[in-house]
Amino acid sequence: MFVKTGDKVKVIAGSEKGKEGTVLSVNVKENRVVVKGVNMIKKATKASASNANGGVVETEGSIHASNVKVIAKAESNKD
């Protein structure tokens, strides 16, 4: 896959078009990436030992890899 964890990317298609962020994770099997600060979704969580109150948590959702363009490679990925 052309994008790796840690790369800085720009979203080139979809509702988040124009946003930039760092790749947090890559799912090679489904050809999807999770970009920091892009495609934020709200998820309801139950109360637990680590989260006493529970409630709504905002987290990044995945987007298809074809919707992003690499701006800068991560330092460890420069080949």
UniProtKB/Swiss-Prot annotation:
Presence of the UniProt keyword Ribonucleoprotein in the record: yes
Single GO BP term: translation
Listed GO CC annotations: ribonucleoprotein complex; ribosome
Ribonucleoprotein found in the keyword field: yes
One Pfam family named in its UniProt record: ribosomal_L24
Coiled-coil annotated residue ranges, if any: none
InterPro entries in the record: KOW, Rib_uL2_dom2, Ribosomal_uL24, Ribosomal_uL24_CS, Ribosomal_uL24_KOW, Translation_prot_SH3-like_sf
Keywords recorded for this protein, A-Z: Ribonucleoprotein, Ribosomal protein, RNA-binding, rRNA-binding
A GO term for molecular function: rRNA binding
Superkingdom of this protein's organism: Bacteria
HAMAP family per the UniProt record, alphabetical: Ribosomal_uL24_B (MF_01326_B)
Function (record text): One of two assembly initiator proteins, it binds directly to the 5'-end of the 23S rRNA, where it nucleates assembly of the 50S subunit.
Subunit comment: Part of the 50S ribosomal subunit.
Protein family according to the UniProt entry: Belongs to the universal ribosomal protein uL24 family.
Protein name: Large ribosomal subunit protein uL24
Organism (species): Lactobacillus delbrueckii subsp. bulgaricus (strain ATCC 11842 / DSM 20081 / BCRC 10696 / JCM 1002 / NBRC 13953 / NCIMB 11778 / NCTC 12712 / WDCM 00102 / Lb 14)
Gene behind the chain: rplX
